[in-house]
Amino acid sequence: MSVVPVADVLQGRVAVDSEVTVRGWVRTRRDSKAGFSFLAVYDGSCFDPVQAVINNSLPNYNQEVLRLTTGCSVIVTGKVVASQGQGQSFEIQATSVEVTGWVEDPDTYPMAAKRHSIEYLREVAHLRPRTNLIGAVARVRHTLAQALHRFFNEQGFFWVSTPLITASDTEGAGEMFRVSTLDLENLPRNDQGKVDFDKDFFGKESFLTVSGQLNGETYACALSKIYTFGPTFRAENSNTSRHLAEFWMLEPEVAFANLNDVAGLAEAMLKYVFKAVLEERADDMQFFAERVDKDAIDRLQRFITADFAQVDYTDAVTILENCGKQFENPVYWGVDLSSEHERYLAEEHFKAPVVVKNYPKDIKAFYMRLNEDGKTVAAMDVLAPGIGEIIGGSQREERLDVLDARMAEMGLNKEDYWWYRDLRRYGTVPHSGFGLGFERLIAYVTGVQNVRDVIPFPRTPRNATF
């Protein structure tokens, strides 16, 4: 007799008539007048629970089985048989049911067997993975992460672990969380009366990273093809469905690559992971299509077969100015495109994923390569129908004199980036990369509208519970 996941039973990987044990939690219990009870038992290995048929001849039937409620944990042993009921092919004829944990008060159990609002579930984030929705999100999140690792491994990339604590501001935006062990009640001061960070743990001002890119570039300039994948932090006071203070970023970096090279890489990567999630998480994706967003599966299938459009920022602005549509945010050359502009381009004009390239330098970061016109940089955004920007990237500035001039323009002290500048002093190469916000990717795949519901424990302004 072997312990098996529920998924193996339901998906036919266990022979009929074999004795198995499944371990999980009760989703529902139904009692029949014929002297049977039906337990729906789930263990998170797949979307559906397995049905266990319990005969009233079991010694603990009256004392325990009939008291089981949603959320109780059980170990069920029995024979796998073809199911007589609708909805699943196999069930378990139980020979024993061991109760390992009771729900203290079924009437006050926060995850009682009913539908809960998504807002309520955020208040009980420690229990919400027990729901159909968040359980499905968690499995899709896992599958997407595994597919990303697999894709880059197959493409010859190395995964590099970049630091979460940094002294550099990659984006130059200044919206960073400070890391300090100084006594807030007794801060050391220098001669100017400012906080003396020389006395701090790292001997300088330190922050949680907003991006692993700068560190990633150092390894790309030695290993040629690398990617980073981990948490990043933004101290943006944004309470929107698209923002988190802590989120995951995937950032590949490729030596000897130009902007077009990484645009092609981004397209291949997205199509690869979308194909993987449709194949490997068919049951969860069916749930999203039925209960969350009826277009969830079709959207990914269209994306996989679509030819990506490409357009220069300047031409994109012209398209938007001449489309005859009234936008909430004005459009003119030099403005950063808003979500409504991006979605118009992808959904209404091109009706396909689109790569917008060569943005005005004044709205982009210091490290992006200055184009020959002196006004634009080799930057790109990948826009997807249904969400807008899903990837942002650029060719990096490999010319030291141009990089220094850009830093000066933006008021950055080049000495703070001495190690980053060294890459341009010792065997510089053209190189390019992009960033993918992992939670936005999951939201796009599942149709879940708010990124707070696709990360286990969302960190947002005034919320760091759990």
From Swiss-Prot:
UniProt xrefs under Pfam families: tRNA-synt_2, tRNA_anti-codon
Compartment(s) of residence: Cytoplasm
Entries under InterPro entries matching the protein: Aa-tRNA-synt_II, aa-tRNA-synth_II, aa-tRNA-synth_II/BPL/LPL, Asn-tRNA-ligase, Asp/Asn-tRNA-synth_IIb, NA-bd_OB-fold, NA-bd_OB_tRNA
The keyword Protease is assigned to this record: no
A GO CC annotation given for this chain: cytoplasm
Complexes and interactors: Homodimer.
GO molecular function: asparagine-tRNA ligase activity; ATP binding; nucleic acid binding
Catalytic reactions of this protein: tRNA(Asn) + L-asparagine + ATP = L-asparaginyl-tRNA(Asn) + AMP + diphosphate + H(+)
E.C. no: 6.1.1.22
Gene Ontology biological process: asparaginyl-tRNA aminoacylation
Family note: Belongs to the class-II aminoacyl-tRNA synthetase family.
Organism: Klebsiella pneumoniae subsp. pneumoniae (strain ATCC 700721 / MGH 78578)
Record protein name field: Asparagine--tRNA ligase
Disulfide bonds: none
Alphabetical UniProt keywords: Aminoacyl-tRNA synthetase, ATP-binding, Cytoplasm, Ligase, Nucleotide-binding, Protein biosynthesis
UniProt main location, coarse: cytoplasm
